[in-house]
Amino acid sequence: MPQPPLPTLVRDLVRLVVTVMDEIRPRLLQAALSGERSESRNHRHADNFLSQHDLWMHERYRELLSKIIPSYVYASEEADPQIIGDDPDPDLCVLVDPLDTSELAVRALYGYTHVLVYSRQLARPIAAVVGDIFHHVQIYLAARDTTGGEHAFALTRDGTPHPLHLTRTVPLSQALVTNYLMKPAERFHPLTQQTRLLQELGQLSPEGGRRGRLGVDFGSVGLCHIAAGFTDAMIEFAKGFAIWDLAPGHYILNAANGVVLDLQGQPIPLDYRFDTVTDIGKAMNQRRTFIAASSLPLAETILHTLQKT
């Protein structure tokens, strides 16, 4: 069955994100090879690495977004929400994480960039693009079409689209479960305390091998990897993700028929309560724990193994 064409907005967003990635990639490679990481003091998020590249991308996104969206609320990780354009109360809010995993991006290892467009009138996202700066699978996207249906795709560097729609489930003992475990005290140590989860992942399969795996993943792209079928689940139970880390991947995974639950087992809604600019600012200061998975049975199984920390 043919799918409706993607809306102009998301096609424009894809071109915009690819442009920004093409511009920043050589700068990041030069930073990695030279060792000049251009780190800046992070006044907004003291525990997070911040480079001049993050700030440059923040400004570049604002410049380019203003060419395709006349009026919007610009909600970037790197600044307070700001109204752009002539409309004093625009419908659209554009949520941006200019450079996710920047401490690895300046080492030319991993780097991602997130854009989500949210309709305050509809109280839900209408488009999201997650870009992978260094890999061949370059873009993950989701968009709402004119009929109200939602579709998710991955695009390779040559522009080939791959529809994303999850229909399978795997038992936890055969799943690849990821977690952002890079920070030893805040994230890795709490993960080591999840003994039931680790035991379930280490169970023997019917064929006799141990097929469960635990991996590392990052921000929204971790949920996109589930949407594409590359991984099976992602968990965040320690510190929680900020909305710019979670929301774009949440929308893409939801459009691909995946699930995102809170730690009480309830689906996390796509209504982010962006009713006013003040509300957007409040949402930017909150964090959410979650279980994201390719299927509800897998998410619920993981939930039952997690121990309160």
Roles of regions detected by a PLM:
Residues V73, A127, D232-A233:
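Short, Asp-centered acidic motifs that coordinate Mg2+ and/or phosphate
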Residues M1-S34, Q194-R196, Q203-T309:
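Oxyanion/phosphate-interacting regions
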Residues I24, D54, L65, A142, ...:
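Residue-level signal for inorganic ion chemistry
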Residues V73-E77, A105, G212-D217:
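General beta-strand structural signal in soluble alpha/beta enzymes
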Residues P90-V129:
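Glycine-rich active-site/cofactor-binding loop and its immediate structural neighborhood
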Residues T113-L223, V277-T309:
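Acidic beta-strand-loop-alpha-helix segment within the catalytic core
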Residues M1-L99, L303-K308:
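N-terminal subdomain of lithium-sensitive/metallo-dependent phosphomonoesterases centered on the IMPase/IPPase/PAP
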